[in-house]
Amino acid sequence: MLTDRPQISSTGKQYGAKGSTVNVECKVRSVPLPEEVTWIRNNEVIDFATSEHYSFSEEKKPDGVINTLHIQRAGSGDFGLYNCTVVNSMGIDFLAITLIEKGQC
């Protein structure tokens, strides 16, 4: 496999329902695997260590990862812009993802 900077292939618009757990997906092709995946909301890095509202999971693939941000009991203020930033030893990529409330399109 060729090594290269990370490349995010997720869509820039994702959807979720108010009151439920909403998942925002950051699908990344990255060889070597990412050293870091960072989620940003309102210009601040989401601190998973201190947050009960946000968590994440990561599924490793041979050529990258799928990193999913989980938002517990999503409220009106949770919809809007998120940023997924991915770093590996070859470079960086980022994607602005707009989370849209289902039924509000």
Residue ranges and their predicted role:
Residues M1-C105:
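Immunoglobulin-superfamily
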